[in-house]
């Protein structure tokens, strides 16, 4: 029997062998605080590739040193960082998966000794520092940094780029009226609040012709914040600009209580897919093969982003295949261990 979860998926000229994506998750493991890939990262990402994930996405990687969430984040702000990232893509490719990178700037959530930057001088909460409102010059420099990061991503051998526009980081801060109180062309109307992301996408398109994803927070979980319907318009603009897929997460732009349950964010992937007519990725407490297969069969999303479940078990793909009764092609090195495996939950 054929299963959609294990069917190929082609975006532009890149074909994923299945619909399982390793969701980007910060490991805070650049131990020398220089943004460099370490041996841990090679093992971490390579193991998930060997575990038969279709697309392995490297964690949020800062386009500027001051754009890191922490000083142990990965970086792509300098050519000296390309070599390490190329080792990672080679490791991933050699183990049978495609490689993606998430380009990011933490904005007001940067927990560094340097000043935090944001569209407006509003802290995330009472314990975090007051950010500095970005000047237009700083905005232009950041747009350029995303473009230069895309060039380095290409040189490092990545197949897919994802722009991190979610979770209350810099791009999300520009999009949301809760965090963007500017009165210039970068604030006010939805068109103006989208301008920063528009310029980033335009700049990346000048140097990158591969698949381009954007991760969004499709709900601010605040009465005065953005809802998934607001993001329908944003994603229509993204599609017009050539974005290929929307990775649908939610929350974290402001402190909020969120009702979390299995597949709680799938509704956003479905809504965006249906109303913006664009491919989507579903993420959030997707933990079994049956659950993932149902999402795809219901046409609620095109790709399944797996996060914590892949931290618990890097061989999630094999377990999902066994659960569904699908014969997954194994690395030849593992052929001596046939039969079912389980997580023993």
UniProtKB/Swiss-Prot annotation:
E.C. no: 1.6.99.1
Binding site for FMN: 23-26, 60, 102, 215, 307-308
Catalytic activity entry: A + NADPH + H(+) = AH2 + NADP(+)
Any Pfam family the entry gives: Oxidored_FMN
Keyword hit for NADP: yes
Amino-acid positions noted as binding substrate in the UniProt annotation, renumbered to this chain: 28, 164-167
GO biological-process terms attached to the record: response to toxic substance
Any GO MF annotation of the entry: FMN binding
Catalytic EC class: oxidoreductase
InterPro entries referenced in this protein's UniProt entry, alphabetically: Aldolase_TIM, NADPH_DH_bac, OxRdtase_FMN_N, YqjM-like
Cofactor: FMN
UniProt keyword terms in alphabetical order: Detoxification, Flavoprotein, FMN, NADP, Oxidoreductase
Subunit and interaction comment: Homotetramer.
Role noted for this protein: Catalyzes the reduction of the double bond of an array of alpha,beta-unsaturated aldehydes and ketones. It also reduces the nitro group of nitroester and nitroaromatic compounds. It could have a role in detoxification processes.
Stated family: Belongs to the NADH:flavin oxidoreductase/NADH oxidase family. NamA subfamily.
Record HAMAP family: NamA
Protein name (database record): NADPH dehydrogenase
Record organism: Bacillus cereus (strain AH187)
